[in-house]
């Protein structure tokens, strides 16, 4: 069940800025009207009457104004996307944000009052499995954790201990070093997959033998409670419940995380797998 957040609302903030497709819009400028909903937890501020326990909407309004005035975009879509990301990165207390940017009297030569773009963006929690059985496996895993933590829109929150595990599938190969991590990210699933593939490639990963030896293997196990089934990406990972080398380190950092389809927790899946292997 998703957590319900409180809301801090900023409505119809007027900003004179220079966004648009036409050159005149970029040079002469025009009025934009911005509304924002900041999804957060106001409980502590409500109990203590302490502004530092909340989000200062005056500072947020000033940030929005400055951001839209110092940057120039052709599309409202781009302006909204960049603004939402900037706000989420600037204030840790904002878990999710809704942004609407209105453009009154847009130059379309028709009698309209306004056009607008409204988006909702927020933080997501992903669990990533790590594995290596070629070369300095610990170095490869450590470097992968570091690379993920250095992504501007992601933060590694917890990393499991690394475990030495026997190979899965193709057994005629060296033992693996495996682990799992919890990632807080603004990336969407396919964006995250692209980053994982990039990190694997930089580690010299070659996809020659299915389930074969590799310098680095990174898999998305969970992404919030998303269920996604595509040819090139399935979430939750379809084999996770069969893999002790995933469930053991994952159980260390998220034992009660539940599978969105089966409803079973990670520790329950691990117990069942151990029973089957007896």
Q: What positions do the PLM features span?
A:
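N-terminal, polar/charged subdomain of small-to-medium soluble alpha/beta proteins
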Residues: 1-128, 132
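Extended accessory regions or peripheral subdomains of proteins
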Residues: 125-145
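Short connector loops at helix/strand junctions that flank enzyme active sites
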Residues: 29-33, 92-94, 112, 174-178, ...
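Short, surface-exposed acidic-centric catalytic microdomains
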Residues: 43-58, 143, 148-188
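Flexible, gly/pro- and Lys/Arg-enriched active-site loops
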Residues: 41-46, 123, 168-175, 187, ...
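Hydrophobic C-terminal alpha-helix "anchor/cap" residues
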Residues: 83, 87-88, 148-149, 196
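Short loop/turn motifs enriched for small/polar and acidic residues
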Residues: 100-104, 162-164, 221-223
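A short coil-to-beta-strand element that immediately follows conserved catalytic motifs
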Residues: 94-98, 154-160, 213
